[in-house]
Amino acid sequence: MNKVNIKDSQNFITSKYHIEKIMNCISLDEKDNIFEIGAGKGHFTAELVKRCNFVTAIEIDSKLCEVTRNKLLNYPNYQIVNDDILKFTFPSHNPYKIFGSIPYNISTNIIRKIVFESSATISYLIVEYGFAKRLLDTNRSLALLLMAEVDISILAKIPRYYFHPKPKVDSALIVLKRKPAKMAFKERKKYETFVMKWVNKEYEKLFTKNQFNKALKHARIYDINNISFEQFVSLFNSYKIFNG
């Protein structure tokens, strides 16, 4: 298997005007502690340190770490960690938020890490637009797994010409808001099994025919290919009742 090279998928937003437009879409204040995924050349980092209490910028490229340090000489409220985000360990205590323009080719891995391996209350991420839409698609396992832990929204579509070099596709600014109640480990394993069988249309492994009809009726589902997350949760709850 070829090793993923994060550096090969780096596209930067450098225009102050475009950066300001994006920053105005997110909610940050002077009390916030932020982890930034991919400091790049420090263009967003420079805005984050002005608005937040403290910024921890994680950047895999040592040369870009130095570029960012030189850009932030007048600011004491930051640290740069030269590390691979997929190997980085987020703290499990104290409230914090995450911001990042993440590489398209490892977007799934990064988002899974944020949702399942961090305790971030809110994450603002710039991702490929098609990927953002797939995160809202309840016919996909990734979306259903994430929605159990976070609320997902698209805040803005970001045109490809904002980036240099210009990618072939548009991007989106999304927000992941942590739900108040974290799913217990045992419950999550049962939920994961349900999700995978549902997405693979293995309904007969989840319900008897009679149970399935009752579960669909209770959730008010008339088209199993077009359901809301709330309806999916209703199905899962019915599954738990039928299976003790």
UniProtKB/Swiss-Prot annotation:
Residue positions binding S-adenosyl-L-methionine: N11, I13, G38, E59, D84, S101
Q: What class of enzyme is it?
A: transferase
State the InterPro entries in the record.
Answer: KsgA/Erm, rRNA_Ade_diMease-like_C, rRNA_Ade_Mease_Trfase_CS, rRNA_Ade_methylase_Trfase_N, SAM-dependent_MTases_sf
Mind telling me which Pfam families this protein's record contains? RrnaAD
| Coiled-coil regions listed in the entry | none
Query: What keywords sit in the KW lines?
Result: Antibiotic resistance, Methyltransferase, RNA-binding, S-adenosyl-L-methionine, Transferase
Q: Which cysteines are joined by disulfide bonds?
A: none
Q: Which SUPFAM superfamilies does the annotation name?
A: S-adenosyl-L-methionine-dependent methyltransferases (SSF53335)
Biological process (GO), any one: response to antibiotic
Is the keyword Transferase in the record? yes
Q: Name one GO molecular function term.
A: rRNA (adenine-N6,N6-)-dimethyltransferase activity
Family under the similarity heading: Belongs to the class I-like SAM-binding methyltransferase superfamily. rRNA adenine N(6)-methyltransferase family.
Q: Which purpose does this protein serve, as stated in its record?
A: Involved in erythromycin resistance.
Supply the name of the protein.
rRNA adenine N-6-methyltransferase
Query: Which species is listed as the source?
Result: Lysinibacillus sphaericus
